[in-house]
């Protein structure tokens, strides 16, 4: 009969019985030395975030391990895990937000200031001996969003923690916003969902994980969808794909890139087989700045090099190609005029916009017609930061900006008001009942489907709308209507573009293109019309979406080639015979929707809308610092303040992009930079750059002096 290592205790809860055993063992036995280590992932955690206290080198032949809050007080137990019975027993200070894993790690969700403090892991052997006591101090930072409101998102996403690791270390691919009502979760090595590339799957019904063909024995999959990779090698670098399958058989997919730092290889000798890789320099770029997609280890004997926007090798998504034989580059359909391709394969993007964010694919073709493909993700910092007195504007961003047929599109809502009664999504610029997709009531926390709901839309409580399996018919303008508690109404519009790999001119579909897509105040914008219908009797332009006389800009009669100016004509509009409209000297008042209305000879009508985005050049920001002279090991906070909204923030140190260390942290809106603790090398000049899609400005320098005691 097996002898229990837990002392009997009448009228004790399971936790107290286990606690009594552990307490007595503390008196009887001295802990032995064990190389158990605990790492906080991420190293800095802000209120409301999640943190994993990741355990390495957990001893073998254990009967149990216990986590408790503090250094010595065993009564502050969080949870105990029995390896014998594979069961978790929660302790007195368990808040309901902690999850204990069989590898010893502790997961804390939605952390608060009360979670700050020491955490201790104690391991107990099969003989009842204490094997190790290991402690870690967790510091939860106050949310520093006073300079701007963070955008919320219900989109499935993955965070690599840490963002870049060295060979032999561990990485956690942390899943955020996992959908509800899941059937299974899958991880794949690469950017393609293919059975042979499956690392592991987690089946909700059986609460178990199953390794796949691509499992190396070093991956651990958790019930929250996260994937832990231990003892990573440079072969682990690259893209990983997370796929979720819900009970209604709907799927969602998210990608993450694992970066393995192999710089030490130069000291140990070159690798036996150089791997083709692409590096984004810098890793995150502000709008208006430039970024280089730097290619490493380009193969020899090449015939051509190709760059594509996205992860799919479609001709319409080709940015540029470089032909080795002619030593020349050829521009592709997806070239925006801001890309420069070099003979070493690298691609330079200038004046980056939020539309440039996403994946890019490099394809090489050798003289023996062998191809290699590698992906890189471009991260564009579009976080807004503004003066705390400036209200945050309700905005909607389509993610991705241009979707391929069959992909999913998230209409991501930012700055949803708190005091709302309900919100409604419409598949049109008109807020009519027949165009209603769904209505969300905050009072009862319920979504009502409307007549325009196709069965592919999912509405989230943060206002965002997910459109799955997009088709050509989903292209167009969508309207979000907000109804406040005082019954005030606010609306916002967003354009959804679904690529069908066919140019609009071949479809005969009437479309309008804004040239340029983002307009600086005082500049000109052309609303360029494609595929104007034949046999027209007349066409009219309106400011807004309502076809009423007071909003009419101009009416053109085809037969008489005569134009009539309407009440909404400002004197700055020019109408061309092909239907296009040129707006001179644009102002902020010109921002918004415009409607082209056509009537043919059979009195059949057609209307189409376009949105003009007009931006003011940003004003120069300034930096506020808590102290300009600080002592070593103290802390300092720098805040970038701007009078503009809808801007991106980039921090500069000594005229170079600031490289964040583990001692530095940014607020979610990038407005505040915290350094804790301060070191001597932090002394120097700090600047912040504020940018929007049409301009950027840099603050005057602020000098930080570090006093060495």
Curated annotation (Swiss-Prot):
Expression detected only in placenta. It comes from the Eukaryota. One of its GO terms (cellular component) is external side of plasma membrane. Glycans are attached at residues 73, 86, 103, 110, 133, 207, 224, 231, 327, 344, 351, 381, 462, 561, 578, 585. GO terms for biological process: immune response; T cell activation. SMART domains: IG (SM00409), IGc2 (SM00408). Keywords: Glycoprotein, Immunoglobulin domain, Repeat, Signal. Possibly involved in cell adhesion. This is Cell adhesion molecule CEACAM3. It comes from Rattus norvegicus (Rat).
């Amino acid at each position: 009969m097996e002898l229990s290592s837990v002392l009997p205790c009448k009228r004790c809860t399971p936790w107290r019985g286990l606690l009594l055993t552990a307490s007595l063992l503390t008196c009887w036995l001295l802990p032995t030395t064990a190389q158990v280590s605990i790492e906080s992932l991420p190293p800095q955690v802000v209120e409301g975030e999640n943190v994993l206290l990741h355990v390495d080198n957990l001893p073998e032949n254990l009967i149990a391990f216990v986590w408790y809050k503090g250094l010595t007080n065993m009564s502050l137990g969080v949870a105990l895990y029995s390896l014998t019975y594979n069961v978790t027993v929660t302790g007195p200070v368990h808040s309901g937000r902690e999850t204990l894993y069989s590898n010893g790690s502790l997961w804390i969700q939605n952390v608060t200031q009360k979670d700050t403090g020491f955490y201790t892991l104690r391991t107990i052997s099969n003989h009842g001996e204490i094997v190790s006591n290991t402690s870690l101090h967790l510091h939860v930072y106050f949310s520093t969003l006073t300079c701007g409101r963070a955008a919320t998102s219900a989109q499935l996403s993955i965070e690599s923690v840490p963002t870049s690791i060295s060979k032999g270390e561990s990485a956690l691919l942390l899943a955020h916003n996992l959908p509800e009502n899941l059937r299974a979760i899958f991880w794949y090595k690469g950017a393609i969902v293919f059975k042979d590339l499956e690392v592991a799957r987690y089946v909700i019904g059986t609460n178990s994980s199953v390794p796949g063909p691509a499992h190396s024995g070093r991956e651990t999959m958790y019930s929250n969808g996260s994937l832990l990779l231990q003892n990573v090698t440079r072969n682990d670098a690259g893209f990983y794909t997370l796929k979720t399958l819900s009970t209604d058989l709907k799927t969602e997919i998210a990608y993450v890139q694992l970066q393995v730092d192999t710089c030490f290889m130069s000291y140990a000798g070159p690798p036996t087989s150089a791997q083709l890789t692409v590096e984004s320099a810098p890793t995150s770029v502000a709008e208006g700045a430039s970024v280089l997609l730097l290619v490493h280890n380009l193969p020899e004997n090449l015939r051509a090099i190709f760059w594509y926007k996205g992860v799919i090798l479609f001709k319409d998504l080709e940015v540029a190609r470089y032909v080795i034989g002619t030593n020349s580059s050829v521009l592709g359909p997806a070239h925006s005029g801001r890309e420069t391709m070099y003979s070493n394969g690298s691609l330079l993007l200038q004046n980056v916009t939020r539309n440039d964010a996403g994946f890019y694919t490099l394809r090489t073709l050798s003289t023996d017609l062998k191809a290699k493909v590698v992906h890189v993700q471009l991260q564009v910092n579009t976080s807004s930061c503004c003066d705390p007195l400036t209200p945050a504007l309700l905005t909607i961003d389509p993610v991705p900006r241009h979707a391929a047929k069959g992909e999913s599109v998230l209409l991501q809502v930012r700055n949803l008001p708190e005091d709302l009664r309900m919100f409604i999504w419409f598949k049109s610029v008109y807020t009519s009942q027949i165009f209603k997709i769904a209505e969300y009531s905050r009072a009862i926390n319920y979504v009502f489907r409307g007549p325009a709901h196709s069965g592919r839309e999912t509405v989230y409580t943060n206002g965002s709308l997910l459109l799955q399996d997009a088709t050509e018919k989903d292209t167009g303008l969508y309207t979000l209507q907000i109804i406040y508690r005082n019954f005030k109404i606010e609306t916002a519009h967003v354009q959804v573009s679904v690529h069908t790999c066919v140019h609009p001119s071949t479809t005969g579909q009437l479309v309008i293109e804004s040239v340029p897509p983002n307009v600086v105040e005082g500049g000109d914008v052309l609303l360029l019309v494609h595929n104007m219908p034949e046999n027209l009797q007349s066409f009219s332009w309106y400011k807004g979406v309502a076809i009423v006389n007071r909003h009419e800009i101009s009416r053109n009669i085809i037969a008489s080639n005569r134009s009539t100016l309407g009440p909404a004509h400002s004197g700055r509009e020019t109408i061309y015979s092909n239907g296009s409209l040129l707006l001179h000297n644009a102002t902020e008042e010109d921002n918004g929707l415009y409607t082209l209305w056509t009537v043919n000879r059979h009195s059949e009508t057609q209307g189409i809308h376009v949105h003009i985005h007009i931006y003011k050049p940003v004003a120069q920001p300034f930096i506020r610092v808590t102290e300009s002279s600080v002592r070593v090991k103290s802390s300092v906070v720098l805040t970038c303040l701007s009078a503009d909204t809808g801007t991106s923030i980039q921090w500069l140190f000594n005229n170079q992009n600031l490289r964040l260390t583990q001692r530095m942290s940014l607020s979610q809106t990038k407005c505040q930079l915290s350094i804790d603790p301060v070191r001597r090398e932090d002394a120097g000049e700090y600047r912040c750059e504020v940018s929007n899609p049409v301009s950027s400005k840099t603050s005057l320098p602020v000098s930080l002096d570090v006093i060495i005691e």
